[in-house]
Regions:
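Conserved ABC ATPase "signature" region
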Residues: 205-223
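ABC ATPase NBD coupling module
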Residues: 49-54, 97-102, 155-171, 197, ...
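ABC ATPase "signature
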Residues: 41-45, 313-314
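Conserved ABC transporter NBD signature motif
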Residues: 146-154
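A short, surface-exposed alpha-helical micro-motif characterized by mixed small hydrophobic
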Residues: 26-28, 295-297
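A short, proline-enriched helix->beta-strand linker immediately N-terminal to the Walker B motif
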Residues: 247-251
Length: 326
């Protein structure tokens, strides 16, 4: 898309105003750059000069916002999740001479992988490669074919009622922190909602105390629990979404592009938080993203997807040192 925009700009001799928080895109396509902070332009310059010699402290902070990298696991345990021959199909309906014709579109094709406790599997690929379909299939938000085993138990064919007991062990954090939190509920209600389903034996007081603790664990103040989502920034909302997943004490968390809607400095903070929580609680992550910088910081192993297929699956160091696929 960026190449197309740049091609059209040159062809029609038009100007292009690009608004983004992705500095990699800015560096690639922009001639001049304006940096904004709190509604004001704090620095503007030619792209090459701004990236080589930034002047304002906020610009320097953005450019230097590199997340710390995860320490690789040396001793691996038995797989916590095994996926074998996963296939996902979507019904695609078209009209041909006023007659409806249904065709199956295969989003995921014979995908298999294993992940051990405490590991992070990074899944990367272009839009439409099947990344999010994998995530949704694993928590049974969409139907799929194949088998997946959680701690050696085949959970792929369980009914919704049977799978409910596993939901607290496998949680998901979605991409958009603005859409994934109900605007009608307080943060207390949002974070503690899962407790009322999976831990009905807990009293209201116990739930409130647990919610306070988990909110503190993600770097927020428990005095914020009576507020509503619109009162928080994007980064704070994603911390709330993380707290909602953590409160059920899961073993596996699937993160579907959780940093893509955040600016560079906040991305780095969220990555650092996820790494700290993983070390503290021995969490296993499946992290889906198209941002290789974030994937590199978080992952132990990386799976590259294209058109629903795995085209490369290797340890992080090998993928970045000697990628096999173009």
């Amino acid at each position: 898309i960026l190449d197309l925009l740049d091609k059209l700009r040159k062809k029609y001799k038009m100007s292009l105003l690009l608004i983004t928080h992705d500095l990699g895109i800015v560096k690639k396509i922009a001639n001049r750059v304006c940096v904004m902070e709190k509604g004001k332009i704090v620095e503007q310059n030619d792209s090459s000069k701004l990236f080589s010699k930034p002047e304002h402290i906020y610009t320097k902070k953005l450019i230097n916002s590199e997340p710390r990298e995860k320490k690789l696991i040396k001793k691996k345990s038995d797989p916590i999740l095994s996926v074998k021959n996963l296939n996902v199909f979507y019904k695609k309906t078209s009209r041909f001479f006023l007659k409806k014709k249904s065709n199956d579109c295969q989003a995921v094709k014979n995908l298999s992988f294993e992940i051990s406790k405490g590991e992070t599997l990074g899944i990367v690929g272009e839009s439409g490669s099947g990344k999010s379909s994998v995530a949704q299939a694993l928590i049974k938000l969409i139907s799929s074919e194949g088998n997946f085993f959680f701690k050696n138990k085949n959970i792929s064919n369980l009914s919704d009622k049977e799978f409910r007991s596993y939901r607290k062990n496998i949680q998901i954090i979605f991409q958009d922190p603005f859409a994934s939190l109900s605007p009608r509920l307080t943060i207390q209600d949002i974070v503690s909602e899962g407790l009322e389903v999976h831990y009905k034996e807990k009293t209201k007081k116990e739930m409130k105390e647990l919610t306070k603790k988990i909110i503190n664990d993600v770097g927020l103040d428990s005095t914020m629990l009576s507020r509503y989502p619109h009162e928080f920034s994007g980064g704070q909302r994603q911390r709330i979404a993380i707290a909602r997943a953590l409160i059920l004490n899961p073993e596996l968390i699937i993160l579907d592009e959780p940093t893509s809607a955040l600016d560079m400095t906040v991305q780095s903070q969220i990555v650092d938080l996820l790494l700290s929580l993983q070390e503290e609680k021995q969490l296993t992550y499946i992290f889906i993203s198209h941002d290789l910088k974030i994937i590199r910081a978080l992952s132990d192993k990386i799976m590259v997807m294209k058109s629903g297929k795995v085209i490369e699956f290797e340890e992080k160091k090998k993928i970045f040192a000697k990628p096999k696929n173009e």
